[in-house]
Amino acid sequence: MTEPTWKTVASEKQQQRESKIPSEWQIPKSSHPAPEVTFVQDFPAKSGMFTNRELQLTAATASDVTAKISTGEWTAVEVTTAVCKRAAVAQQLLNCVTEICFDQAIARAKELDAYFEKEGKTVGPLHGLPISFKDQFNVKGFDSTIGYCSYASKPATADSTLVKLLVKAGAIIYVKSNVPITLMMGESFNNIFGRTLNPRNRELTTGGSSGGEAALVTFCASFLGVGTDIGGSLRIPCSFTGLYGLRPSHGRVSYQHVQNTLLGQEAVRSCAGPMCRAPEDIRLFMSSLAAQQPWLWDPQSLPLPWRAEEEVLPKKLCFGFALGDGHVGPKKLKQAGHAVINFNLTEGKEVNEIMNKMFTADGGAEFQRDTDATGEPLPPTVEYWLGHSSQIKASTVSETWKNQHKKALLAQKFLEKWQATKGRTGTSRPIDGLIMPSTPFPASRHGSGWPWHFGDLSALLDLTTGVFPVTRVNLEKDAVPPSWTPMSVKDKEAMDYYEKPENHENALVGLQLIGRRLEEEKVTAMLTLIRNVLEVDY
């Protein structure tokens, strides 16, 4: 029997990827963790494969790297070589990489070191910093399959604008990371490369659709990754792996020439943003990009420089806090002199319904077309999200307009609710930010069809939103209380997925911080404040 086209494509792509891992960076069979070993976050330190210097370099933040390279203390070559090696190991343990650019990266690092030695200065604020990119971002000469077998062996002829601008600022491209087929799943799985695993528990997902980036960054195989977010695709992975991240409002980060699904769907815009281990790295990314004036290349980019004055926060802040969204069910901030008030969020069900109608306005035709091209199947989790594509009907123009009008009315209603908090904050201002869960549960088991998450509000209303780590699952404290009762059918489904803390051992817990539109500077500053107050240690 002839093998289906998609299986042949997948086999060839995987062989191509593995051939680019140097033999000296391959894990010896005697050292490779057995499948039942779920926690591999500490493998680099315990394996004997890395020198103390390599461990020191890869554990640094992006801000540390750029600072030390700019003074000549570190070289771009040694940093790049170390992180490429760690990414190679991450791939073997976590299956998080799609495209490998190690040779090109090291060659670029040599060029940057030569420039620094000759000129005595850096080429830009990101000089020598290796940055990993979600598979969506086009890098000339490499595929951007976004999980579809039908997109394989079609290398990009030019870089995405964001890639060009970051390279211009001194960044080094060395790897692209795994995503789910369709880009519309909360787990990074596709038929080409397979499933990405969580380094803290390989039986758990890193989320999606930027799950490959999350695996790389949390494993210290990337200093800073670039993900995207249309309904939680950056925030969910950050929450599942203990990272900081930022979903900016549309227009702050260039999205030009990025491979994507749902092309032409502009009612809810996908945005690119940073994923990292420190909030200072969000600032480094955003300010460095703004300094390149992306609006001169990308007509969708707003002519808005990084506004340092907006990072200066009032002495006392007030945060709204929502335990859920009314559909699926702060002590240290108060101790630090800030106020925290309840924010009754009841829009969840309406937001989710509007989003789903927008994403399936074509009746699922695009997803079906791109899988039919090679005969590959859609995963059960995608079928779950689509509500089984065969049952979805394309929206009429009238229905689409009506749905977009609902979005406009909801935006006004939410703004009024935000403004109405002014009388309760004690600061003579409305709340400065809204803290709420990113998901109704910590990192889930592989193959889970998600009943619900909390990512849609920010995406639908285009609100600047950050993510920050809080804690990890505690096997003793996090059992389901006997007195718990669900708010809705979806709420019960969410708790059924959680079931018991043992299913989420070593999983991390993150929250999201929602600001207003185009408040990237303020939200980034508040993430730093929250980090300093919480002093998270997991």
From Swiss-Prot:
Q: Give the EC number(s) under which this enzyme is classified.
A: 3.5.1.4
Null mutant phenotype reads: Decreases significantly the production of KK-1.
Q: What does the record give as its pathway?
A: Secondary metabolite biosynthesis
Q: Which UniProt keywords apply?
A: Antibiotic biosynthesis, Hydrolase
* Gene3D superfamilies named in the record: Amidase signature (AS) domain
Catalysed reaction equations from the record: a monocarboxylic acid amide + H2O = a monocarboxylate + NH4(+)
Leading EC class: hydrolase
Query: What's the short name of a Pfam family annotated to this entry?
Result: Amidase
Q: Which GO terms describe its molecular function?
A: amidase activity
Q: Where is this region: Disordered?
A: 1-32
What induces this one? Expression is positively regulated by the KK-1 cluster-specific transcription factor kk1F.
Look up keyword Hydrolase and say if it applies: yes
Catalytic residues in the record: 134 (charge relay system), 209 (charge relay system), 233 (acyl-ester intermediate)
GO BP annotation list = antibiotic biosynthetic process
Give start-end ranges for the coiled-coil region(s): none
Q: What does this protein do?
A: Putative amidase; part of the gene cluster that mediates the biosynthesis of KK-1, a novel cyclic depsipeptide with 10 residues which is a promising active compound with high activity against many plant pathogens, especially Botrytis cinerea. The role of kk1C in KK-1 biosynthesis has still to be determined.
* Family of this protein: Belongs to the amidase family.
> What protein name does the entry list?
Putative amidase kk1C
Per the UniProt record, the source organism is Curvularia clavata
At the highest ranks, the source species' classification is: Eukaryota, Fungi, Dikarya, Ascomycota, Pezizomycotina
